[in-house]
Amino acid sequence: MAAHHRQNTAGRRKVQVSYVIRDEVEKYNRNGVNALQLDPALNRLFTAGRDSIIRIWSVNQHKQDPYIASMEHHTDWVNDIVLCCNGKTLISASSDTTVKVWNAHKGFCMSTLRTHKDYVKALAYAKDKELVASAGLDRQIFLWDVNTLTALTASNNTVTTSSLSGNKDSIYSLAMNQLGTIIVSGSTEKVLRVWDPRTCAKLMKLKGHTDNVKALLLNRDGTQCLSGSSDGTIRLWSLGQQRCIATYRVHDEGVWALQVNDAFTHVYSGGRDRKIYCTDLRNPDIRVLICEEKAPVLKMELDRSADPPPAIWVATTKSTVNKWILKGIHNFRASGDYDNDCTNPITPLCTQPDQVIKGGASIIQCHILNDKRHILTKDTNNNVAYWDVLKACKVEDLGKVDFEDEIKKRFKMVYVPNWFSVDLKTGMLTITLDESDCFAAWVSAKDAGFSSPDGSDPKLNLGGLLLQALLEYWPRTHVNPMDEEENEVNHVNGEQENRVQKGNGYFQVPPHTPVIFGEAGGRTLFRLLCRDSGGETESMLLNETVPQWVIDITVDKNMPKFNKIPFYLQPHASSGAKTLKKDRLSASDMLQVRKVMEHVYEKIINLDNESQTTSSSNNEKPGEQEKEEDIAVLAEEKIELLCQDQVLDPNMDLRTVKHFIWKSGGDLTLHYRQKST
């Protein structure tokens, strides 16, 4: 009954289908890295990617390949991560509106929390209490007991959460002290709001920043807070005095990331200006430029294996993550070669990172070709690639070639309606199918490069074929299953089921392709790999999630209707023929011009009445076929079809004529005339 109710709910909301074209193993961060967590016990670094993937890396420098594993379940940017339970559990927050709980050692997702209604931007962790807070653009803060979260199972899946309300704007930063007695949020409201998480009581509001508050830190006992803002300043606040006690103007632009040593005496800051400084909180004039990154700094993570910290890991809007050594920082400071005037250029402590976790390229530009099947892309390394949307794969790497030239080179005078949309947000190609236009594009099998067993050239619906391929492994889509009795006999005899038809009969997509069912507007309902839809749990969730418009084509095999195009057919002015009564004709938008020419020849010009009479009295099929072939040949020899006074190619279809030649509102008008001999 519950499943039935949920199916109804899915029916009421508008559900889209998306899939990602990618390699099975995406080893490298394909986009900027939003968050970092270091596990010193296992020498592992966790990176949270804008490509939706959390990756685990070894920070042992003797390892040639630092990649360990990927943690994949999110469908949009992962904005923040925290390691809990001495590194056993990882909590992640994403723009897909979910918070996920992971087994950090084994790398699998244990549960998903769906309380947020918009992007989840920040997490905070109280180590002594195993308490995590999440916050985001929905202005809500939720508190989670980590021990409760890790105990969740398929049957015990109810979790209670406390919430902190009162934020008036989107939250971008969050901090909680280790004892779990104070929580602070920063937002586009430009103020810091402070609560007691034990009672959910609002304690205070701190004013001073003039722009979004992007980074927050609290000391252990929750008496002092550091904030970094897009206004370019770092502020130190006394929560006891409820005021700002120091302002540090270290950066030329917005401050987006902060770290502080355990003693809360030195702050490490980075942001839009790409520079990373260490500032002595007790003597603000003393600040050391540690390094300069190649892109704006998004997050930093101190290596706390010793005191003072020996190194700092830095993530930026680029996909590479760097480790910078802090070894000489005290000598550097003692020498007096520090920055006491941030307008003067100074030499950074480090010019080269000590360790580099190499990133991959991100797709930044794409062009959908006229056939509405292939896409050209350009990435951050200026490499151009050619992709097949229908088969969900890369066809060819073209290298560093001119993008516009490649587009021109592949232009074809053919029009196919739009039937999908493309998103590059994760740095990979995400294709989305929507009920409103998914079935708009029909092509002939021959034009699509597919052959039929019977040699015919059927019309194929691109969106329909793709949906059938994406759900090929879902048993509910399989055709002609044996009845249970036969199935049992077969099972006993060990025979394979050969009668079941899967997929679309023309092509398959790579089995590792991620398929995402989500609400229009972003909330993900279900993500799975194409090959996993045969699993019992996945199959059950698909029953609850797949919308009716997808069921119609994949399960019920109801093909959508052909698109019709209305048009008028008139003699050309140069023919001297009398204008016909203006009858509005209608045909499939894929009808070729040659078929209209045949219609003109046979029904209007009617050049050879005798031949027609003879043929019509002959009912034998060979005669009919000859007649058809004769008319086709004669029509092309004797008839010309024009649109806007341009002679049409017989191979062109009506939708292409309308799009490229008619180019105006109202119904398409075609003119015919006899060729001059």
From Swiss-Prot:
Spans annotated as Disordered: 607-628
Gene Ontology biological process terms in this record: DNA damage response; double-strand break repair via homologous recombination; positive regulation of double-strand break repair via homologous recombination
Record has Nucleotide-binding as a keyword: no
Family annotation (Pfam families): DUF3337, WD40
Family membership noted in the UniProt record: Belongs to the WD repeat WDR48 family.
WD repeat start and end residues: 28-67, 73-112, 115-154, 166-205, 208-247, 250-289, 292-334, 358-452
GO molecular function: deubiquitinase activator activity; DNA binding; double-stranded DNA binding; single-stranded DNA binding; ubiquitin binding
Domain notes: The WD repeats are required for the interaction with deubiquitinating enzymes USP1, USP12 and USP46.
Cited function: Regulator of deubiquitinating complexes, which acts as a strong activator of USP1, USP12 and USP46. Enhances the USP1-mediated deubiquitination of FANCD2; USP1 being almost inactive by itself. Activates deubiquitination by increasing the catalytic turnover without increasing the affinity of deubiquitinating enzymes for the substrate. Also activates deubiquitinating activity of complexes containing USP12. Docks at the distal end of the USP12 fingers domain and induces a cascade of structural changes leading to the activation of the enzyme.
Transmembrane feature ranges: none
Claim: Nucleus is one of the keywords in the record: yes
Example of a GO cellular component annotation carried by this entry: late endosome
Family matches, as InterPro entries: G-protein_beta_WD-40_rep (IPR020472), WD40/YVTN_repeat-like_dom_sf (IPR015943), WD40_repeat_CS (IPR019775), WD40_repeat_dom_sf (IPR036322), WD40_rpt (IPR001680), WDR48 (IPR051246), WDR48/Bun107 (IPR021772)
Classification via SMART domains: WD40
Major subcellular site: nucleus
SUBUNIT field: Interacts with USP46. Interacts with USP1. Interacts with USP12. Component of the USP12-WDR20-WDR48 deubiquitinating complex. Component of the USP12-DMWD-WDR48 deubiquitinating complex. Interacts with PHLPP1. Interacts with RAD51AP1; the interaction is direct and promotes formation of a trimeric complex with RAD51 via RAD51AP1. Interacts with ATAD5; the interaction regulates USP1-mediated PCNA deubiquitination. Interacts with RAD51; the interaction is enhanced under replication stress.
The protein, known as: WD repeat-containing protein 48
Name of the gene encoding the protein in the UniProt record: WDR48
